[in-house]
Swiss-Prot record:
GO terms for molecular function: glucuronosyl-N-acetylglucosaminyl-proteoglycan 4-alpha-N-acetylglucosaminyltransferase activity; metal ion binding; N-acetylglucosaminyl-proteoglycan 4-beta-glucuronosyltransferase activity; protein heterodimerization activity; protein homodimerization activity. It is found in: Golgi apparatus membrane; Golgi apparatus, cis-Golgi network membrane; Endoplasmic reticulum membrane. Signal peptide: none annotated. This is Exostosin-1.
Length: 746
């Protein structure tokens, strides 16, 4: 028994010694190898590897949390080839591994929200018109601040758009100029806009200076160099791209079937040599001269004749036969191949023309790909499968083509029709990254009216907006809040405001009534107000200005708002009918008093008219129903300059609201019934409400029209000839068969 114990102890000791020798030898060899590498690197002056690189394997899980610069310098691993090391060191962006979590300071945005600071322009620095438009769009936005201490994001005033060294717009010595900025901080929380980078012959994406930890809003950026959740891919746009507004899409009506004269078209340069030449040189294989027109020309550049091939003369001749605009507007699909760079002007041209883009640019990070689902608006092709493009697009069902075409128009008008929209979309994407808890989802970005008009600060629930009831399977609100704007003192029980209050309160759809007291006289006593079945809340305006009627009051508990002037004359039946109509069109303004706009050729300006014509483009908010979200948009989206103008004139607030809603919906308001007179004509002439009789009042409204159109960059108002009346309205049938029979007597 004792012998067995001795043998067991001896065997255990031997095993321990063997294990100790084995692990000790491995560690000794590793340390010797490590010391030799250190000695070798020391002799060659190489960077000493960090001790963190020799942590045990279980530390690999901590890799995502390493500092970005430490990860960036990890080029001394034993498994990295010399070629990989050279490629890493020659990367166009030294901060290639930057992400919002590692290269952005969120603390700057917590205190003052998302504010953007633009550096003051330096004397003697040339700035291209396109970059001036970008800076103007930022400075005119609600994000702009002139105080750098309040800023969350910084934008250079130095022109970084064109970094092609052969371009006359190229800014020299940009590296030293940027480094001298006292707020640069290695680019942290900075945004750099760029359209062109690199030059002949390779057109790399190097912008020519160290961007540090700055974000890039860049055109023609490749997926290889694009830093997800950090950079923003923007479209390539020309110097003639409008600063604000922009033309609407060219799709005026939907044709069924949605096929045009040409199936697939392209007209552009053919590069005979160099980068981007492979695809365009092969387009002639697909061109059939009938419904597939892919036209190229060799006539560009100074030395094109030196490189011309046997096809150039034939291509040049056929190229001149067709008008590009005619092709563009009569084609179902438009080919968008890469050029010298990945992006192309053809991309935006196809979107505007409702020609479905067929992308043929491998490795291009499509514009705003972080939020836009391009599969709903474009066909993503592969340069290597060029010959399969015709058969692929011919196999697309007509229903799908119609949906693609409609989506091109939405995306064009929502995000691409002006420099301002491109810039604001870029800023909104960055803001969503910072405040992820209230960021917009894919449905908002890819469905009308788009991410620029749906402000997540209002609500994180889509059902609180008037645009998504059908998507969510929700019914429109069943109740409304009446908001009566009172500006005259209450001196008689027969005043129109009291009659209006009683009529609105009797509506079966009325939840409450809010009286906004903007009168200079003190509030009347409670017993002066009539008794009603619904609550009546009187709010005394602090500033007593016109814009206060559109403030997003917390007292408004319903989504629907019935906006009323104090001298409006409406019956309960008229209120009920207008509300039932609004339930079918919750995103629009629905009401009674209609007005119109027109273009005055003699004065070359917009005009305003209250004449009774066969069409209208505005429904005044003195007797109208709309969604309360427009109160929030009016207050937080529109610039202070327009609201200050309205307050100073005590006029035009209803016109501005119509501009806003039409700009959002791209639709006209809706007039109900043929009622024309909606004002009480017996109001005292000493009251503020008699401003309608003031001769200057009409002239002011003419001026407002042009000021508003100037800010929007275009005329958003849309004419309509539709009027909605009750079923059987004035038909020769029994009055008992009519639901809104009282309307016929009014």
């Amino acid at each position: 028994m004792q012998a067995k114990k001795r043998y067991f102890i001896l065997l255990s000791a031997g095993s321990c010694l063997a294990l100790l020798f084995y692990f000790g030898g491995v560690q000794f060899r590793a340390s010797r190898s490590h010391s030799r590498r250190e000695e070798h690197s020391g002799r060659n002056g190489l960077h000493q590897p960090s001790p963190d690189h020799f942590w045990p394997r279980f530390a690999d899980a901590l890799h995502p949390f390493f500092p970005w610069d430490q990860l960036e310098n990890e080029d001394s691993g034993v498994h990295v080839s010399p070629r990989q090391k050279r490629d890493a060191n020659s990367s166009v962006y030294k901060g290639k591994k930057c992400r919002m979590e590692s290269c952005f300071d969120f603390a700057l945005c917590k205190k003052n929200g998302f504010k953007v600071y633009v550096y003051p322009q330096q004397k003697g620095e040339k700035i291209a018109e396109s970059y001036q438009n970008i800076l103007a769009a930022i400075e005119g936005s609600r994000f702009y601040t002139s105080d750098p201490s309040q800023a969350c994001l910084f934008v250079l005033s130095l022109d970084t758009l064109d970094r092609d060294q052969l371009s006359p717009q190229y800014v020299h010595n940009l590296r030293s100029k940027v480094q001298s900025l006292h707020l640069w901080n290695n680019g942290r929380n900075h945004l750099i806009f760029n359209l062109y980078s690199g030059t002949w012959p390779d057109y790399t994406e190097d912008v020519g200076f160290d961007i540090g930890q700055a974000m890039l809003a860049k055109a023609s950026i490749s997926t290889e160099n694009f830093r997800p959740n950090f950079d923003v891919s923007i479209p390539l746009f020309s110097k003639d791209h409008p600063r604000t507004g922009g033309e609407r899409g060219f799709l005026k009506f939907n044709t069924i079937p949605p096929l045009r004269k040409y199936m697939l078209v392209f007209k552009g340069k053919r590069y005979l040599t160099g980068i981007g030449s492979d695809t365009r040189n092969a387009l002639y294989h697909v061109h059939n001269g009938e419904d597939v027109l892919l036209l190229t020309t060799c006539k560009h550049g100074k030395d094109w004749q030196k490189h011309k091939d046997s096809r150039c003369d034939r291509d040049n001749t056929e190229y001149e036969k067709y008008d590009y605009r005619e092709m563009l507007h009569n084609a179902t699909f438009c080919l968008v191949p890469r050029g010298r760079r990945l992006g192309s002007f053809r991309f935006l041209e196809a979107l505007q023309a409702a020609c479905v883009p067929v992308m043929l640019s491998n490795g291009w990070e499509l514009p705003f790909s972080e939020v836009i689902n391009w599969n709903q608006a474009a066909v993503i092709g592969d340069e290597r499968l060029l010959l399969q493009i015709p058969s692929t697009i011919r196999s697309i069902h007509q229903d799908k083509i119609l949906a693609l075409r409609q989506q091109t128009q939405f995306l064009w008008e929502a995000y691409f029709s002006s420099v301002e929209k491109i810039v604001l979309t870029t800023l909104e994407i960055i803001q969503d990254r910072i405040f992820k808890h209230i960021s917009r989802n894919s449905l908002i970005w890819n469905k009308h009216p788009g991410g620029l008009f749906v402000l997540p600060q209002y609500s994180s629930y889509l059902g609180d907006f008037p645009y998504y009831y059908a998507n969510l399977g929700l019914k429109p609100p069943s109740k409304f809040t009446a908001v009566i704007h009172a500006v005259t003192p209450l001196v008689s029980q027969s005043q129109p405001v009291l009659k209006l209050l009683v009529a609105a309160a009797k509506s079966q759809y009325c939840a409450q009534i809010i009286v906004l007291w903007n009168c200079d006289k003190p509030l009347p006593a409670k017993h002066r107000w009539p008794a009603t079945a619904v609550p009546v809340i009187v709010i005394e305006g602090e500033s007593k200005v016109m814009s206060s009627r559109f403030l997003p009051y917390d007292n408004i508990i319903t989504d629907a708002v019935l906006s009323l002037d104090e001298d409006t004359v409406l019956s309960t039946t008229e209120v009920d009918f207008a509300f039932t109509v609004w339930q079918s069109f919750p995103e629009r303004i629905v009401g009674y008093p209609a007005r119109s706009h027109f273009w005055d050729n003699s004065k070359e300006r917009w005009g305003y008219t209250s004449k009774w014509t066969n069409d209208y483009s505005m429904v005044l908010t003195g007797a109208a129903i709309y969604h309360k979200y427009y109160h929030y948009l009016y207050t937080h989206y529109l610039p202070a300059s327009l609201k200050n103008m309205v307050d100073q004139l005590a006029n035009c607030e209803d016109i501005l609201m119509n501009f806003l809603v039409s700009a959002v919906t791209k639709l006209p308001p809706i007039k109900v019934t043929q009622k024309k007179q909606y004002k009480e004509t017996m109001m005292g002439q000493t009251s503020r409400a008699s401003r309608w009789a003031d001769p200057d009042h009409f002239a002011q409204r003419q001026s407002c029209m042009n000021t508003f159109a100037s800010w929007f960059g275009y005329m958003p108002l849309i004419h309509s000839q539709m009027r909605l009346d009750p079923v059987l309205f004035k038909d020769q049938v029994s009055i008992l068969r009519k639901k809104y029979r009282d309307i016929e007597r009014l």
